[in-house]
Amino acid sequence: MQRRQSSKHSKRPLQVHHSNQTDLSAWRKGGTVDTEKSAQNRQSLSDQKNDNEQDSLEQALSYFEKIQDRVSLKKSEVLQKHLSTMESIALKRGLPPEGFDVLLDVALSGKLADTVNTRLLKSLIPASAIPESSIVSSVSWFCVSKCSSNIQLLFLRWLITMFDFIDHKEQVHALYGIFFSFLNDEKLCPYICHVLYLLTRKENVKPFRVRRLLDLQSKMGMQPHLQALLSLYKLFCPELVSITLPQKMKTYFKNADGPWKAAINAVRQRNQANSTVPQPLLLGTAQPHSRKRKWNTQLIVPASSANAQNLVVGGKMSRADSYSANESFPVEQLRTFPQLLQNIHRLEFPSQMGSVLTNPLLLHYMNCSKDESVYLRLYYWMGQTLQEECTWCVVDNNQYEEEFRGFLETVYKAECFLQEGFPSCEEFLYRSLPLWDGVSCRSQILQLVSWIPLSTFSEMKSQLCDPLAQLFFTSSLYFKCSVLESLKELLQNWLNWHVVQLDSESDSQFSSLNTTLSGLVNGVAELINFVGRISTAALHLEKSHTFLLYFILDFYETVCDIYLKYKLPLLIMPPAGVFYPALLSMDSVNLNQLCYIMYRYRTNLIAAKENEMSKKKIQQFKFSSQTYQEYNQYIIAMVGCLWTSSAFQKDNHPEGIRLDDELLKKTGVREYKNSFNIVYHPALMCYAVDFLQQAWPDDTTFNFNLIKGKKWNWYLRYLYGQGLEGLKLFIESSINRVSKASQSKAEDEDEKV
């Protein structure tokens, strides 16, 4: 009644006197008032419509609650009216929590025909949350089998779909044994297994249950739903499940959300279109929730009904009064890190596991938790959501691309926070990349690629590298650069994981580390070789584009320091198809970057050689002589180009730039031998011109032959002063004369000090 009174008062027009409004300002003011009045009238009509719908909903619920005898749908106009009302309101705005007790009891009690019960179950769309008590009550009706098997099946599908909307689950977990007893029903078995998969905790795994599942498997064969439950049992208690099960994650259960997903989407769309309309229908004290897409709703930590009694409106309550020592601390009240530390033993994860992704404190807690069921719940929910919401894997999902992009961004941020990838994301990428167009959610997909966990490269090659390479070769330059950036981050994440593992491993576990290290070395080597192959091809396709070359060299800047920086016994040189385009690049940034990379290769190889010669450490892995040979070939080519002007004569690499003098003379270039030294090199010629202008301001001939002898050394110092640090490090480390000169200079400075 209060709502109706308020709506009546809101209909009163503003009292504005128009008799004296003769000037323009008064006329404008009157127009503004008319606009406000019109908006207020529309709001009043909306409130009145909302009140009428709420009255209709209350009448419908009251009718269904009082049904005692079987009523025919065709003969009862009242039933038809209230059923239609219930369906229209549910599909439009969702049902309040208090409505589920009534409707579930009616649908499962068998008082009405299956046609009516089916329509009731399909209209059970929550506006906020589903009370746990209504689930317990409905399971009791489910057990007495008053309804048909088809209704039982539909109820299980509804329960699976709405599982994360249940406000609290302790009493539902207590029903584990009851659900388990229905496994013998072949029709219900797949869905019962699905419910059990969602409910299973370690304490639920018992020997008699394992035996029951094994017996069912021997009768029915290797059914996916039975494998799912057995895999979960084996994870919790490996000593109880001795059979071998498929290790690779797969889709164990069929999609059960049928009619409800479409209804949830419809509710979300209408509420977004009518954002100024009052909140969803509320009965009692239920709190309003925005009806977004199912996964989006789950990103908000829900307030559980079990903890609602602890909340005080308009006042404060001490923690000592609010929570006893054995009482769980509601996660929706978790605000600070000290709170997390004080209550970490009393925290309980929310029913909607998706909310963990957006809460840093819960992510911290998840990182500390040893409860495997927590990870399984999150991985299962995430895997299902990614599969169902993927805009290029599911028909008619293109309209939700912006939301899906936001969801992928949320998942990626959670992975960055935890510093590890989610297995469900890896599985999603392996399935979706062959269908991906390289455009939809490009940035987010490539970000997720960078967090794929380390696995055998044979699996990655067919499921990740092959589809990614197809897109790589057929897409734009900028897509190629994005892929290379993603693969560089993937390599860095693998290497960082290795460093963390080294720090955490003790000496006594070195033997077990060797197996892991061998797998890591092989996986990293395969990834580097893969990037080398696609980079070589990309440079041919893009005509050695400077922008592309920068990203390729950026990748090898990580590769060249693997041994010293990441403590991994591996060094792989870039292929000739990358090295020579960088050496002959027109851009000084790329040339400087290559010089720095070769300097770091030298530093790492010298350190590796010293460790091999030293008897203090037993080398489990040794670099092949081919690595040293390839490095030496590249050094000869670089020094021949940049310093001795003899690259065309001394380069001995099979894919190098060695050419006969007769062929070079035919080019018509006079100083072809000097074409790529530090004076004539296309990437450095602009520096040579500037140096000549500063050294000989009156000379306009730009005679590069003047840069020799002492002028050569002056020019070298000039280059160092231009920020070409990579060039400086390379020349001083790889050229004897300059190296000795720099050493003697350093010694002189030390003596002066």
Swiss-Prot record:
Question: Where would one find the signal peptide in this protein?
Answer: none
Q: Which domain of life is it from?
A: Eukaryota
Q: Just give the chief location class.
A: nucleus
Compositional bias of kind Basic residues: 1-15
Cite the InterPro entries for this sequence. CENP-I (IPR012485)
Answer whether the UniProt record assigns the keyword Nucleotide-binding to this protein. no
State the protein's purpose. Component of the CENPA-HI complex, a centromeric complex involved in assembly of kinetochore proteins, mitotic progression and chromosome segregation. Required for the localization of CENPC but not CENPA to the centromere. It however may be involved in incorporation of newly synthesized CENPA into centromeres via its interaction with the CENPA-NAC complex.
According to its UniProt record, which protein family does this protein belong to?
A: Belongs to the CENP-I/CTF3 family.
Stated name of the protein: Centromere protein I
Give the source species. Gallus gallus (Chicken)
What high-level taxonomic lineage is stated for the organism? Eukaryota, Metazoa, Chordata, Craniata, Vertebrata
Q: Which gene encodes it?
A: CENPI
